[in-house]
Amino acid sequence: MSSEFAGKLGNLGINEQINMGLRLGARYYLGFLLISLIVDIPLALAGVMGDKSSSSILSFFLGIPLIALINPISKVAIIIAIIDITNGVKPTFRRAYSVVFSRFGAVIAASALWLISVAVGVLVLVIPGLFLLIAGQCIMGVVVTENLKGVAAFRRSWELVKPKFWSVLTIFLFVEITPGLLSAPISLLLSNFLGGGNGVWITAIIERAWSSPFVYAILAVMFLDLQAKNKESGS
């Protein structure tokens, strides 16, 4: 699979990126799940705390801003894991996060820059916010694999996304919408089985975490394919 995947990078269409991501997510599911849980567990618990909180301000900050700020940590870790796979190296939690934490400050700074840019764009007008959201889809991968920071990383992300903007938008919508649709019946079953009380916390973790290996793998394949396309074009 590693040589097959590496050989196809730079030549994948939307369906192939999604298919390859799903295949990698399925094959390395437990490993990718372990990598993503380091972020998914606190985000799931924060979401429940936000829902239970009587403070609208606290609920807000435990929602989208927190997700946007720390979610990219797992996204980058899966990119590292898949790069290892393409090189014929077994992906591990330790290896993925050793690379991430070596660039941790730059990753968080890029997340904050992206979050602020999108928020400002949404406040000005919804369309600019959506544009910046898609333009920055490769920013985390660029920070770790190309050692760029801040604005330079954002510009490089746009350079990768620009030729395939609509493809990136399509994949973004796919990974945002599909897990939510599939999680609805899972959440219903878990709620009926576990009930309220402490069951709410367990349900939140499972509901958030089960799809992460597939979502992050698809986004990682998309980034690596766009990066390979860019190199092949000589940009």
Segments predicted by a language model, with ranges:
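Hydrophobic alpha-helical membrane segments
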Residues: 1-235
